[in-house]
Every structure is written in structure tokens, then in C-alpha cells.
Swiss-Prot record:
One of its GO terms (molecular function) is NAD binding. It holds the Pfam family Histidinol_dh. It comes from Photorhabdus laumondii subsp. laumondii (strain DSM 15139 / CIP 105565 / TT01) (Photorhabdus luminescens subsp. laumondii). The modification N6-(pyridoxal phosphate)lysine is found at K655. InterPro entries: Ald_DH/histidinol_DH, Aminotrans_II_pyridoxalP_BS, Aminotransferase_I/II_large, HisP_aminotrans, Histidinol_DH_CS, Hstdl_DH, PyrdxlP-dep_Trfase, PyrdxlP-dep_Trfase_major. GO terms for cellular component: cytosol. The active site is at E328, H329. Transmembrane segments: none annotated. Residues 441-807 are annotated as: Histidinol-phosphate aminotransferase. Its cofactor is Zn(2+); pyridoxal 5'-phosphate. This is Putative histidine biosynthesis bifunctional protein HisCD. The gene is hisCD.
Length: 807
């Protein structure tokens, strides 16, 4: 075992004490002198404010400052002084940091832990934060971006930045990019004191972020332990790096990465762990070559004096050493790094493969470079959006909810001998029983107790509008982007409409090639889905079958009526698994098949549909949902109705007819089935205005206009597929027969959230079986499609070799 970096250490030959010593970090404990000096600085700033800040700047920074705060004119001048290259680089880095941290926005949690007991978890931004940026010969502009960007995303009301004078123009411009205007030219422990306690010029903040020297680190520690101080981001220590490398690693890259961390300071520590001794020797040689060419080679050499090259018996042993050490930065330069990272339990930030240098994370990949060091990775995490937020829980109990919990709470309070806690319950329960108020604990109304159990447990269908969002490009509901021009002609709103408006039925029958008696008009195809279950399925006896991934209302409707479901997952190509369906037809009364299928966009093989119809003859109703059939009319099987009496077809005016807001759909079936559905349908499913506009839409002239729309959408679809297929972030663009496409992304979450915040709303399909990483994109106008491509292009680089799509 040695303290020299050019000597290999064979881990297996070291006993426990030696192994512990090898992984021991350089001591960083603040000296008594530093602690005492910092304590005096804190006291002086708290007592004398700005006067002390000016005096310390003169004494420590050799600078006389008139104005502690940087003026708007100075900030503007700083921006004008920089060349475009540095400004563009900073903008690109901030964009990536923003994308990654936007994706960290927490969701509101709402649960009913038991009937009448409602609990929430919400987040709020920390009201005021202070950012400390060290001075020196090289401006740490990247740290401004790493701290300022998440503070801005979190919505912190006040963001203060302090840095020693004179503040570099790059730091001022970086602060401007992050929306920071309160910038103060003070450094060292006195800056930490000013932000912790406040002065005449510098506002007091709630939490302080940022690195610094021993005095800054000690000042942060001391103010974090004072009631009148401020909390801090995390304990600080020297920078460190551990590399796990196999025989295939490039020794030039490994050496460069080790030196990039060693040059931070003489107390930095770098460690190479590898099972390949030949690689270790090549790295030593390469370090000697590269070290001589570094301007900071003396600093790096001092850091190397307490760094290590360790040879192990296996990559698994490398992982064990890394987890034991818990590095700030971990680089895994192996042939299959993804397999090893699953075993890593403690690291600040991990860099996978030969092409992921630690400097990428330092500046521009998007992850945060403010990381726990000195072994704190066992309990601390890399800086993120959550560090600028605070969690808050909310609970609300109904009277019945309180009664349901009262005995439990009283028993636990009694066990802890906290009588006042118990009384808080006992008095409320007594109040609910006071006869003078006419309240009886047995008669308190709680709607949840009356609701059917399956409804209490039901997860509602999340329609596009129910999911919310604030956008101007809505591509999540498969609607047409422009409203058609129709005017109401009927003036009989004082009268109830016909149950089945004759003109609508007659015209749709003609359009579909059927008799009017085979057509039922309803409030969208969704109503037909429910009507069929109500007519044909006995709860607790019959079964509804469908094949996910598919339209969610089949499941929700069955669950609403308490009807059992069988879900036969589609094949990999999203065609029907006929064998599995045939083996699961017991008690099945109703089958739903979407063709073209939502959300995958593919038409179902007609041979498969015919096979299902034959298997279920006289046993079950087979419902083919043709909501998107206008985009591929050759795939319609409406003409089969004359041969298959158990066939039902669902249609809508929402898609190609561009009338989603009308809520008008149709059921096509035999006369016998239509007659049964008429028994349970609401008396007036179509309002007079709906029937009026639907009849107009079904004229020959407007059908021709609809068909032109289809041609336009198909052209836009093909162009969008081709454009997306060229982007590196896109794993696959699936073929589609509809007005939407399904796209698989390498990072779907980032794409979805980034576009969401830009006002481009897509449909997230990642929770559907087999659709991991997939988003559904409605085909909008040409301009909307171009915006989608532009937004996703910003997250991706273009492949030189486009992927092939089949369509």
C-alpha cells in the first residue's frame, strides 16, 4: 500500500484496516482559528451591517466598494461586453438544465386513506434563497446556472446572489439568464453572514446555497445551527471522483477524467478502480503525459498524492468499493455500464460509458453539478428542484371520518398518556351526539358510505380536458385543429327533440350503406359502449373482454356497472391474440375491439375479426369501434352486418367530421340489437342543436369537405412521421391509419413535460401495457406539426441515418 498514485494497489492483498485507509478522504475539519475567525465575522456583520461589509471587502478583497448592490446599468453593460459564443454556450447549458429540472416538478398527492379521511401532499417554494458564487481567477458561471435555474423554476419569490468583487461579467450575465436582479459584490464568510442575518442592503434569506473556501464552508455551518440564521443546501467538502473501468476503457479518456477532477484543488481526491492491471498501467503512463501539459499541474499533482489506483478481482468488487466510498462523481467506463449502475447505491452523479465525461455534468448535460461530497452521498442527494421547495401535508376529516377514527386516536393518545390529545377527539365526538343540535352519530350523512363499493374504488377515465394543461397546441384528444362553419337552423328550443332525429338517422344510414333501422344515434360512441353493457351484461355473472393497449372507456364502463373484465393483451404488433381470446371466452358476453386501434393507430387484421365473430356466434356481441375509420375507409367492416348478427359497429362525428364538441355518435347493428338499445337509451340523447348540425354535416357537400380534411391530415401525418423519425431522441415512429401517431422516445417523460410547459399538449401513454416510453401525438395543422418538431428537435440531435418507418 502506498500514498503515491503511480503505484498499483491490489485490493485483495489488503487487510480491512488497509482497505479503510485507502478509502479515507483528506481531512477537512475547520481549525479552531478558522472557526473563531468566522464566529467574529458573523457577529460583526449582524451588529454593524453594511459598514462591516465594506470594511471586510477592503481588508480581505483589497477592494473599496461604494455600492454593495450591482446596478441595472452594470448588469446591462456586462451582457454587452460578452461575445456571442460565450452567451450562446451559457444559453444552451441553461436550456438543458431547465429541461432536466422542469421534469422534477412534483405532483400533488391526494388520497382518501379511509372513508371520510382525506390527505394531501403539496409543495410550496422556499420564499427567499441566497446563492453564493466564489470569486477567483476563473468565474464559476456554471454554478450560477446550476443554482439559479432551479430557483427560478421552483418559483422562489426572492433570489439573492453574492460574489466577491469585482464580479465577472460572465457571472452577471448568467444571473440575468436566471432572472436574478439582486446581486451583491461581497464575498467570503461575510457574504454568508449578510444573507443569513440581513443588512441595510442585503435582504435576509431562508436558505443559502453554493460552494466556497474553508471560511465560507464554516460560515454556512455556523449560520445553519443558529435560530436567527438560515438553512443551507448540504455539507461541503473537496471535489472527488471514482472511475470504474474495464479492459475496454480508453486509458487516454480515463486519465483525462482523473486529471479534470484533480485540478480542482490540492485536497481533491480521485480513485481508479479496475479489474484490469494492464489498463491501470496505461492510465499511469497517460497521466504522466497529460499532467505536464496542464497549467494547474502543481495543484493536480498534490491531489494525486492522496489518490489511488486500485486493482480488483472483478467488476462486482469495483461496485462494492464504490458503494463503500460513495463518491461525489462516479464514471463507469465499461462495455455495459447500464448493468452496473443498477447496483450502485451511493453516488452524487453517475456518468455512463466512454462518451460521458464528468465535465459534461459540470456544465451542460442538464443534471446539477452541486453534489454531496466527503461520503455524504449515503444520506444526501444531488441538488435538485426539491431543494428549493418545501413539502406540506393537508388533511380534512368529515364528521363520519372523524367518528371512524376516533377510537383508534383515543386509544393511541391514552397509551402515550397525552390526555389533551385524547380530549381533542372526545369533545368532538360528544358534540356530534348533543341532542340539542339534533345530531346523532349514527345518522351523520357520508355519501361515500352510501356509494357502491366498485364506484368508491373506481379510477375515472382521464379525458384530455380533465387532464388539464394550459396550451395553445392541443394534440392530446385526436381532434381536428380548426372548427367547421355550421349555423343552427332550427328554432324550436322550447320543444323536446325527437329521440332519434329522422334526418340524422336517414343521412347517416345512407352514408354507412345501411338501412335507417340499423342506426342508433347517441351522445358520442361512449354512450353506446355503456348501453351495450347495460343491455347484455349481468353484473357478477357476465364478462366484458377487450385487448389492451386500447381505448380506456371499455374498462371504465365495465367497472362502473360492476361487470367483470378480461384483458387479453395484444401481440407485439398490436394485432389480436386469437388463441388467447379463444381460450378465455368462458362467460364473455361482450367484446370490444378498436379498429383502427386507439392509441396504437393500426387497423386490426380483418381475418382476425372474422375469426372472432365466428368463435362468438350465438355466444357474445362483438363490438368494433370504428371511431377513426374515415382515415382508412377501406378497413371498415360495416358491410359485414348482413352476415354477422352478433356484430355491432361504433362510429362518431368527433374525428374526421371535426365535430368533437357536438358529442354525436352512432351504433350500427341488426334491427334486433337496435331495438334492445332503444329500450334503455335516455329519452332525448341528441339535443336539437346537435341534431341540426349533425344533419348538416351529413349532406353530400359536407361529406366531401370531410374527405378533403382526411387527405390534409394524412399528408400532415406523413410529414410529421418523417420529421420525427430523424431525431435522435425518437426511438421509433409507429405506422398509423388514423389522425394521430404513436411515438416511442428514449426519454418520453422529458419530452412530454417540456412540451407541456411550452403549451404543446400531448397524450402520455407510458402506463398502457407495452407502451413504455410512448406518447400519442394528434395530427394538427401544418403549423402545429412544425412546432412539435421544433420543440422536440431542441431536445435532440438529428440522426445521420433516418430510421425506416412502415406506413
Amino acid at each position: 500500500m502506498t500514498d503515491h498514485f503511480d503505484t498499483l494497489i491490489r485490493w485483495q492483498e489488503c487487510h480491512d484496516e488497509q482497505q479503510n485507509a485507502l478509502l479515507t478522504r483528506p481531512a477537512i475539519s475547520a481549525s479552531v482559528e478558522i472557526s473563531r475567525t468566522v464566529e467574529q465575522i458573523l457577529h460583526a456583520v449582524k451588529e454593524y451591517g453594511d459598514h462591516t461589509l465594506r470594511e471586510f471587502s477592503r481588508r480581505f478583497d483589497k477592494t473599496v466598494i461604494e455600492n454593495i448592490r450591482i446596478s441595472p446599468e452594470e448588469i446591462a453593460a456586462a451582457e454587452n461586453s460578452l461575445n456571442n459564443d460565450i452567451k450562446q454556450a451559457m444559453q444552451q447549458a441553461m436550456n438543458n438544465i431547465r429541461v432536466f429540472h422542469e421534469a422534477q416538478k412534483p405532483i400533488k398527492i391526494e388520497v382518501e386513506t379511509q372513508p371520510g379521511v382525506y390527505c394531501q401532499q403539496v409543495t410550496r417554494p422556499i420564499d427567499s434563497v441566497g446563492l453564493y458564487i466564489p470569486g477567483g481567477s476563473a468565474p464559476l458561471l456554471s454554478t450560477v446556472l446550476m443554482l439559479g435555474t432551479p430557483a427560478q423554476i421552483a418559483g422562489c419569490h426572492k433570489v439573492v446572489l453574492c460574489s466577491p468583487p469585482p464580479i465577472a461579467n460572465e457571472i452577471l450575465y448568467a444571473a440575468t439568464l436566471c432572472g436574478i436582479t439582486e446581486i451583491f459584490q461581497i464575498g467570503g464568510a461575510q457574504a454568508i453572514a449578510a444573507m443569513a442575518f440581513g443588512t441595510e442592503s442585503v435582504p435576509k434569506v431562508d436558505k443559502i446555497f453554493g460552494p466556497g473556501n474553508a471560511y465560507v464552508t464554516e460560515a454556512k455551518r455556523q449560520v445553519s445551527q443558529r435560530v436567527d440564521g438560515a438553512t443551507i443546501d448540504m455539507p461541503a467538502g473537496p471535489s472527488e471522483l471514482l472511475i470504474i473501468a474495464d479492459a475496454g476503457a480508453n486509458p487516454v479518456f480515463v486519465a483525462a477524467d482523473l486529471l479534470s477532477q484533480a485540478e480542482h484543488g490540492p485536497d481533491s481526491q480521485v480513485i481508479l478502480v479496475t479489474p484490469d492491471e494492464a489498463l491501470a498501467k496505461k492510465v499511469i503512463t497517460e497521466i504522466e503525459k497529460q499532467l505536464t501539459r496542464l497549467p494547474r499541474n502543481q495543484i493536480a499533482a498534490k491531489a494525486l498524492a492522496h489518490s489511488r489506483i486500485i486493482v480488483t478481482t472483478s467488476l462486482q468488487q469495483c461496485v462494492e468499493i464504490s458503494n463503500r466510498y460513495g463518491p461525489e462523481h462516479l464514471i463507469i467506463q465499461t462495455r455495459q455500464p447500464e448493468q452496473l449502475v443498477e447496483k450502485i447505491t451511493s453516488a452524487g452523479s453517475v456518468f455512463l460509458g466512454d462518451w460521458s465525461p464528468e465535465s459534461a455534468g459540470d456544465y451542460a448535460s442538464g443534471t446539477n453539478h452541486v453534489l454531496p461530497t466527503y461520503g455524504y452521498t449515503s444520506t444526501y442527494s444531488s441538488l435538485g428542484l426539491a431543494d428549493f421547495l418545501k413539502r406540506m401535508t393537508i388533511q380534512q376529516l368529515t364528521p363520519q371520518g372523524l367518528l371512524n377514527l376516533s377510537q383508534t386516536i383515543e386509544t393511541l393518545a391514552q397509551a402515550e398518556q397525552l390526555t389533551a390529545h385524547k380530549n381533542a377527539l372526545t369533545l368532538r365526538v360528544a358534540a356530534l351526539n348533543i341532542a340539542g343540535q339534533g345530531v346523532n352519530m349514527n345518522n351523520i350523512f357520508d355519501a361515500n358510505l352510501l356509494a357502491r363499493e366498485n364506484i368508491r374504488k373506481l379510477t375515472p377515465y382521464m379525458s384530455a380536458r380533465r387532464l388539464g394543461g394550459k396550451g395553445d397546441v392541443w394534440l392530446n384528444a385526436n381532434e381536428y385543429p380548426l372548427a367547421p362553419d355550421f349555423q343552427c337552423t332550427e328554432q324550436t328550443l322550447n320543444r323536446y327533440p325527437d329521440c332519434q332525429p329522422a334526418s340524422v338517422i336517414r343521412r347517416y344510414a345512407a352514408y354507412a350503406g345501411l338501412q335507417p333501422e340499423q342506426v342508433l344515434a347517441c351522445r358520442g360512441a361512449d354512450e353506446s359502449i355503456e348501453l351495450l353493457i347495460r343491455v347484455f351484461c349481468e353484473p357478477g355473472q357476465d364478462v366484458v373482454l377487450f385487448c389492451p393497449p386500447t381505448y380506456g372507456m371499455y374498462s371504465v364502463s365495465a367497472e362502473t356497472f360492476g361487470v367483470e373484465q378480461k384483458k387479453i393483451t395484444a401481440l407485439e404488433n398490436w394485432q389480436l391474440d386469437i388463441e388467447a381470446i379463444e381460450n378465455n371466452l368462458d362467460r364473455v358476453k361482450l367484446i370490444y375491439i378498436c379498429s383502427p386501434n386507439n392509441p396504437t393507430g393500426n387497423a386490426i387484421n380483418p381475418d382476425s375479426l372474422r375469426k372472432i365473430l365466428e368463435l362468438t356466434a350465438n355466444r357474445a356481441i362483438v363490438t368494433i369501434d370504428e371511431a377513426y375509420i374515415e382515415f382508412c375507409p377501406e378497413n371498415s367492416i360495416a358491410s359485414w352486418l348482413k352476415n354477422y348478427p352478433n356484430l355491432v359497429i361504433l362510429r362518431t362525428l368527433s374525428k374526421a367530421f371535426a365535430l368533437a364538441g357536438l358529442r354525436c355518435g352512432f351504433t350500427l347493428a341488426s334491427v334486433d340489437i337496435i331495438t334492445l338499445l332503444l329500450k334503455v337509451i335516455a329519452p332525448y340523447p341528441l339535443s336539437t342543436p346537435v341534431a341540426d348540425i349533425a344533419a348538416q354535416a351529413l349532406t353530400a357537400e359536407n361529406i366531401a369537405i370531410m374527405q378533403k380534411r382526411v387527405v390534409e391530415i394524412r399528408e400532415n401525418r406523413n410529414d410529421l412521421q418523417q420529421a420525427l423519425n430523424k431525431l435522435a431522441i425518437v426511438e421509433k415512429v409507429f405506422p398509423s391509419e388514423t389522425n394521430y401517431i404513436l411515438v416511442k422516445f428514449y426519454d418520453a417523460e422529458t419530452v412530454f413535460k417540456t412540451l407541456w410547459h411550452q403549451g404543446i399538449i400531448l397524450r402520455d401513454q407510458r402506463k398502457q401495457p407495452g407502451l413504455e416510453g410512448c406518447l400519442r401525438i394528434t395530427i394538427g395543422s401544418r403549423k402545429e406539426c412544425e412546432r412539435v418538431v421544433e420543440a422536440i428537435s431542441a431536445l435532440s440531435t438529428v440522426n445521420e441515418q433516418p430510421k425506416e418507418i412502415a406506413n
